[in-house]
Amino acid sequence: CSVGWKEIRAAASHYFRIEESVAADGVRVLSSPLENDPRVLSGESGAAGFGTAFELLFHKAQYQEEISSLGLNSESVLLFFNTEGVTDRKNFLKIVWEGAFAEKV
């Protein structure tokens, strides 16, 4: 993993360290689409990027500095690569049906 991280770090302009709840929110939102959006079944690793964007944009007031640094605005188009399907069905159901790793309000 340290070899891969060196390459990513050299090429990436931003990165985030996230809580389990952020990745789990990504799993939940992707599996429960609105209107005509396609349903995406993903594990936590695959949904982490989407979950991060969802967290930033759903809580804009809290993350204004990060959103500005990324240059995100109403014209932005985001592309996500899901790198993991549902490899652990039991954990997937805990997240989606039972609310595992839900953020405490």
Identify the meaning behind each predicted range.
Residues 1-70:
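Active-site-adjacent helical/loop segments in soluble small-molecule enzymes
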Residues 50-105:
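Phosphate-binding loop/pocket of nucleotide- and phosphate-handling active sites
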